Amino acid sequence: MQKLTILLLVAAVLMSTQALIRGGVEKRQEAKRNFFSKRKTTAESWWEGECRTWYAPCNFPSQCCSEVCSSKTGRCLTW
């Protein structure tokens, strides 16, 4: 009888641990999904004038839609 009780307790602990782990994974996946859904695509950024197109003058990579600013020419490059 004692062995059965211990076995049931161990099973209950394992199941509750698994439920806690599964809940944590789902929260992380939801956070990732929310993070990526908030980001704009390159086309959306360009359309709204938030970045510069190919070969436009630039000083910093963040100014270009491709995020590649040539230090040699001072212009946005393609990917």
UniProtKB/Swiss-Prot annotation:
Cellular component aspect of the GO annotation: extracellular region
Propiece span(s): 20-50
Subcellular location: Secreted
Residues of the signal peptide: 1-19
Record key words, sorted: Disulfide bond, Knottin, Neurotoxin, Secreted, Signal, Toxin
Keyword rRNA processing: no
InterPro entries: Conotoxin
GO MF annotations in UniProt: ion channel inhibitor activity; toxin activity
Family of the protein in this entry: Belongs to the conotoxin O2 superfamily.
Domain remark in the UniProt entry: The presence of a 'disulfide through disulfide knot' structurally defines this protein as a knottin. The cysteine framework is VI/VII (C-C-CC-C-C).
The name this protein goes by in its record: Conotoxin VnMEKL-024
Taxonomic lineage from the root: Eukaryota, Metazoa, Spiralia, Lophotrochozoa, Mollusca
